[in-house]
């Protein structure tokens, strides 16, 4: 068994309650942090080599050091708990099982940043997790870990948990800030970065749930000890959400540096393939990263062993590599259709695009429509080249990375599995005869409705609703005037 930093006590009965969590050393890092200089905490995080666990992998200590301390404006820490990436569910698991560890991490990190008002922004669909966190925060207030003059230190901190409305785009830090301010969740143009102009125009740091939950261990044990775990610049442990055609799906905490083959095939982790079918492909970091075929999953293009690290997973660039991303590890056996998988992802990104940038708004729509045609036996060879052209025009031409996230899976699928796309063109009748196509006639209807200008019909419905609201409001005011 590897080192456990976050999940060491996860199976302790009632660990979600304050009393049990405190008995296991909970909130000790807050006591220690209150006696340390804030800059010393930041330096320990820098020494640790901790990288953001939300997907980008940016060094956390460096991100903290960017925060504006000269303006004199209030600073904020925001926890990004808007976990919406298909294939990723580790943050939900952490918040369900260890809510007080997140609260402790928020307090310790806020001390380091000298923030006095911090927020946890949680995904709209996680309402039960919202209630779990709210209870943990109330227990922290009741026991003197939040509020005025925490433990007689003179340090004040208020912590709030806020629920989003279910928009994937709000996982992007500036869109999250916009939503937290009560606005539409559209990403901002950067610069200025949130570390300078963030929440309410104040310096703000946005970190992922897992990132923040690593901080108490670093404060208690030191950055150097954390850096000893892992390999190279990939230090510490990482939570992986394993799913797909494997025997043991679930959330696993691994030491960065184990081999991908060990993670997939070992009984300690994924347990190998279901019914011992051949491995076909894997999405190693959530739906937004390039898919890897079986021949590039365990070995790199240089015939080196591929490791569960940021560097090894990206070896060869997107031509022969991928990203560890958010840790959404989806495994496919030989029964899975890559064209169908690509269509599913394209449909998701089209639905979740905020529409602010034309390349993303229009491009994701075309990606969905063209992949729909190919998946359902209505495509032609030109459609494959059209997909390639569309994704190239999206990538790098949008305000936020959602456009890139929509383009990369399509590019990788065509690069590694073009023969499957061509099969869908050459044998449309075989594609149409598949059971999953017959079971979903609504998808054909939906596609036809889109071609028949469904957006215009929806606009007319919204206009009608608006007119009804105006009429009812006028009627109510007229009644008040009469009486």
Regions flagged by a language model, labelled:
Residues 33-75:
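N-terminal glycine-rich phosphate/pyrophosphate-binding loops that anchor nucleotide-derived ligands
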